[in-house]
Amino acid sequence: MDRRQHDYAASSGLPYAQQQQQQGPNFQQQQQPQFGFHPQHPQYPSPMNASGFIPPHPSMQQFPYQHPMHQQQQPQHLPHPPHPQMFGQQQPQAFLPHLPPHHLPPPFPGPYDSAPPPPPPADPELQKRIDKLVEYSVKNGPEFEAMMRDRQKDNPDYAFLFGGEGHGYYRYKHFLSMHPPGGPFDPPFPSSSMPMIHHPPNPMMSPSMNNVPGALAVPPIRQPPFPPFHDHHQLQQHLPQPHPFAPHARPDFDQSTHAFRGLSGPLPADVAMELNGVLGNLNGTKESIKSAKIWFMQRSPFAPALAEALRDRVFAMDDSDRQMHIVYLANDILFDSLQRRTNLHEFDNEALAFRPILGSMLGRIYHFPQNKEENQSRLEKILQFWASKEVFDQDTISSLEKEMKSGPPANTFSHSPIIAAHALQRPGMLQQPPNSNVSSTMNLEHLTNPVATQQFIPNVMPPGAFPGSIPLNASVPPPTQPPAGEKPPPYPLFPPGLIPGMVRKMQIGSGVPYSPLSPLDIPTVIPPSDTPQSEVLERVSKFFKEIGEVNPSEGPMGSESQDDYDNYERDSPQRKGGACIPPPPNLQVDPETGTYADGSTDKKSGSGRLGLGATADPNEPTQYDDVYTSYRKHRSTNYHTSMSARATTR
């Protein structure tokens, strides 16, 4: 394969060889590189080019393919392959046996766009962010890039959109994704998050779609699928272009038609799965609703599809409280977007996305039998609140209220990607047969237009989308929905924290000063007991037997015979003469207190067993009027008996 240089010269024509011999060594010195630079071609054609040879473009000199053994002679490059008849007049080539530079495919399609590809950024997170944005931009068109420029203009993580770090790599990846060598549109990324399956606008009119397997059936969401990317040039010619010098112009908002111009395609599968988890964890707490709102606002380019998924989730629920949680979430999203409006008289993208679906969603909850009266008053207050805060104009509020009170149409329930993704996780969910006892005539009154007159039925899953599933008729309510005439038991909707607030309000600032309880309000008569007195006495007697004590209500302890010591008259015997012997110390009475040394008083007949303050007659009715008095008498009797016994032994 390797041939010498004279072989090329021998095969060339004679006139050209003689012309090369006449030029001499001066021309060879002129062709040698000086100071390490490649030789520059003359600006004007030399006499040697008078035979029809055109010098190459300077951009083609970036591929010199110089070799040390062949630097004495510079080859002549052509901008395009010459005619076959001119092969005999060309100079012998000094290249090794490989393709010359003008036969190598350039890295870019353009004839002069020969700059080397920019390297990826050093930050792997930035490179991942750029690749993800390029993927979504290719799948959704230039509107997505314009929207991201408008929304992320103050975010330093997206500085590559405005000439920052990684801008060249972003443009290079975007260019390669837009112009792949395999065809007009061949996406280089695996379509894991952006499915490119385009179903026909009406699956009911296409019976061939019934054979699509369930893993590939991702239905559209009320919008026709976006066209392939090679048709975007025709699409851009019909769309109004924003003014290039408007500083606050939003390219995703059509000022003429006031319609959302974001991502109107189907919801990606990964976003649908995330939304399914967010709504599964949604409850009535403020933290849960706030976190769900933040998640929604971070994915605001998919606002129409997300709003559709929220509406479909409301129709799939049979719990009115969870339905109201989604309404509260939509309320927070609308008010968060309201604060970001530059013009209060123009709807933001979130308001435009929720406006077509709010009427049917509110109508579903408004006519739901569970907690019907409470939810109706709540929904009416929410609409009035939106009107007062100018979330929507008065015409829109009136339209929403009319649609809410008229009831949701029977064909609004459909399967969104979030429900489809949820069904993929639980394959047996749709395999239950519908309730045969539920009459379909109750929904016929809501059907204003027959199915045959409808041109587009959005969000209808093909009947064979899931293996083993059954087609779900739109006119039949879900099987889990309770009958309309059956009212569930009332649920205690008592707001937490109400009682402490009421108590605090009564304590502070109520104006009522403190006043003691009046004695007149205290009852003087003990109310009669329902328990018979005999049962009470029996239980008291049983109690004293268990503790080993004597029941005071049954009388004093001891025998019926009176103690001689207790009945002893303590009067001093009268003496008839001799010295007077004083009584012992235990029988001397204290003149100040009138008691003996043991604490007892001077006893008279019948009062030996009574304590301090006891009357002389133990048979008086006041002594044994209750068990407490008798018990006190009994205990004091034992005390005085023991004290007297001790005093006697001394």
Swiss-Prot record:
Under what name is this protein listed? Answer: SUPPRESSOR-OF-WHITE-APRICOT/SURP RNA-binding domain containing protein 1
Q: Where in the cell is it found?
A: Nucleus; Nucleus speckle
Which stretches are tagged as biased composition: Pro residues? 98-123
Q: How does it assemble?
A: Component of the SWAP1-SFPS-RRC1 splicing factor complex which modulates pre-mRNA splicing to promote photomorphogenesis. Interacts with DRT111/RSN2/SFPS and RRC1 in a light-independent manner. Binds to the photoactivated (Pfr) photoreceptor phytochrome B (phyB) in nuclear photobodies.
> What range(s) does the CID domain occupy?
267-408
Q: Keywords for this entry?
A: mRNA processing, mRNA splicing, Nucleus
Q: Which GO terms describe its molecular function?
A: RNA binding
* Gene assigned in the entry: SWAP1
